[in-house]
Amino acid sequence: MAEPPDAATPKTSPYLKGDELSSDSGPLLSIFALQEIMQKVRQAKSEYMAATKDVDLTIPDVQKIIDGVKELASETIYKVVNKPLISYRHIVMQSRDRFLRVDTYYERMSEVGDKIDENEPAKFYETVIKKVRHLRTEGAFVLHNIPTRDHRGMEIADPEILGVDVKSILPVLTAEHRAMVQHILDGAIIENGIVATRDVDVYFGACSESVYRIYNRLQGYIEAVQLEELRAAITWLERLGRRKRMTFSQEFLTDFRRADTIWVLALQLPANPRVIWQVPRCSIANLIMNIATCLPTGEYVSPNPRIASITLTQRITTTGPFAILTGSTPTAQQLDDVRKIYLALMFPGQIVLDLKIDPGERMDPAVRMVAGVVGHLMFTAGPRFTNITQNMARQLDIALADFLLYMYNTRIQVQYGPTGEPLDFRIGRGQYDCNAFRTNFQTGAGYNGWGLVDVENREPAPYDHVQRFIRYCNIDSRELIHPATFGIGMNYYCYNEMLRMLVAAGKDTEAAFFRNMLPFHMVRFARINQIINEDLHSAFSMPDDQFNVLLANMIAGAQERMDPVVLDISWISIWYAFNRSFEPTRRNEMLESAPLIESVYASELTVMKIDMQQMALLQRRFPDVLIEARPTHFWKAVMEVSPEPVRAIMDLAHSHSFINIRDMMRWIGLPSMQPSMKLVLEEEAWAVANDFEELMLTDQVYMFRDMLPEPRLDDIERFRQEGFYYTNMLDGPPTIDRVVQYTYEVARLQANMGQLRAALRRIMDEEGWVRFGGVLRTVRVKFFDSRPPEEILQALPFDYQTSEKGGLTYATIKYANDTTIYYLIYNVEYSNLPDSLVLINPTYVMTKVFINKRIVERVRVGQALAVMNKRFIAYKGKMRIMDITQALKVGTKLAAPTV
């Protein structure tokens, strides 16, 4: 981040920045909170991080991350095109009626991904996930405004949209064959159909089976209309609007329900909060996202200064602790502590305060005593949640006792108890028992939760996981708050008891001050209640089941997945926080889009979980290629291809450096999902990828000595007409009795004995086949019209190297190398001699591959268009395809069309 222009200018008073705290927004406070939390992380982990790897703990830009997530919501995972991909192309040979038909999907898929190495399982995982994403991307298209032509009064499909490229073969066909092809093309009639009361074009074309499955799944998703999901989302948004006191407009509904509109809903509301909260080490990241997306912008308002002037400082000479601090000015660090206090009040239980170890302040009796009094009125310590730690509660008890006892005379009688604990005494003529103010987390005694119900369940909340309503000081957040009148005549148990105790101790001036501060104090907590129960209510809010056990676990010292964040504050900052109230001035700018941000985040997390579940199965399916694989490998592979904003949110507190295998496997096994279009297509892509040959990966690679054909050219015309070619692709696997299975153990044993080459040579001489393990290999497809390079012809299905070092011979053998399926097309001229293709020494090829897919076929002219058997649905040009996902916002008015 660049420094401000005046960064180099010396400041005469570098700490007096009180006015800078006047306005805090949600994103600003989220960055501040993240800075403070990361400071605690640094301190807590500094001891053992010195002995482990270095971790970058820089503070990320939360606003930039959220903007990235919003951009994800605006992206469409499908393409709107006017013609499908060319799925089949033809390679012309010298024959006039025979050609090679190539499935271009397998050609493109063979070029995706890197070379697989059995010693680097991370590369294998990355290759698989890249191929799956490539498949999903190719099949996710919607046809719109397809080109057509008129033929004898009928609408005929343009050849470009049929998915078969016949342009390359037309020049070499006879007139009879060209007429036959043209007749077939003229028969590609466009039919009229109806999808969800919308008129569409229907025609038959060609498409690779894998791509068509993705396309068909996407089309089924669109044809299902998602009407119930949309109604549920609108109903839920209206509920959320009532909870957050925002208006949800339905004006856009009249826009996309017109008869000329096809609308698509890619996400669903509400987001499943379990998906968000089951991510490993997610508590801090979700807390920061809750602050950034929901916390309103506000100002820190001070009370009327006359309250102090007519009570604490009414005399010319004022030497009491409160009077001394009344005119003090906070420093920048102390104002930061005020921010921490209000963050802790807005996130009870999640953020807990503790006192800094500051010998200078601890020795200042005035600061400690004042903080001890106002701390009991600012914080809650049980019975349902707490804002402070046990240590801080005890220190505040001691400070309160010191204030009550620092100056008393014979008129103020004090009777000490037997235990010697803080506040174990009776004071005043009425002998007020100060033991009642000693901290008791089971009853909330001595603090704001004392004698009242500060957590309640009312009407069902929009988010199922957060049904609690916070009631600080027994204030109902639904009440209308007017600062001029609210709080007058109101009270609650702890405040009343504090006034009674102060009067009993002879602190009449301080009691008068607190009595006059009560309306200001009630307005403060009324605002906080509203912020917690309305603005901060989101999927990033901590679930009730985890919130309810925070206090009990803290008291018992039990460690759970969701532990509170402890922030340190100074003694005097408690006084400054008491004299300032957070007054919201405007709602968070991202409040209306927060539900969409949550849904996008949950959807991406679900897709990542599906990917990791499928990756976890690979090691069991193909152990030979994943001998050294660990769960961290597929975790990193999926993270590598996931959107950057989602990775940034998950790693907002740099927790990925400390996630272990147990965290990963536990998350992968949890069943919670967030439905979305991306999830539907991802699941279908993995269903296709269960057959790994669809990803151009195979374990059916054999070593077999075969002679490259060298035919005699006795009849050149017939040879050309046959369309002669050679390939190392097998039509079927060899018979099992002729195949020798070479596992890693067998190969290493023979290599260590120095007999591997000899053993393989003996098998080749006996015309046997060798299969090297069950390792998956990447398969490439190449075509040649002349002799292929020697490195392809002589390639072996394994890598074997020997080296000598220190008098010892070392052998290295690897199976997972790239395999090439090649097609050699023989071209001859009429001037060639009969033995033009014959060599003195034959050429041997050693690698054979079997894939149970029709990648290349030799077909006749009549079969060239026989693959047009897939039904396509295309939306008419005058129809609008509208993605209404962006309309799922509180307060939105219009859905923007994508076409």
From Swiss-Prot:
It is found in: Virion. InterPro entries: Inner_layer_core_VP3_Orbivir, Inner_layer_core_VP3_Reovir. GO terms for molecular function: structural molecule activity. GO terms for cellular component: virion component. Keywords: Virion. The keyword Iron-sulfur does not apply. Pfam families: Orbi_VP3 (PF01700). Residues 1-22 are annotated as: Disordered. The VP3 protein is one of the five proteins (with VP1, VP4, VP6 and VP7) which form the inner capsid of the virus. Belongs to the orbivirus VP3 family. This is Core protein VP3. It comes from Epizootic hemorrhagic disease virus 2 (strain Australia).
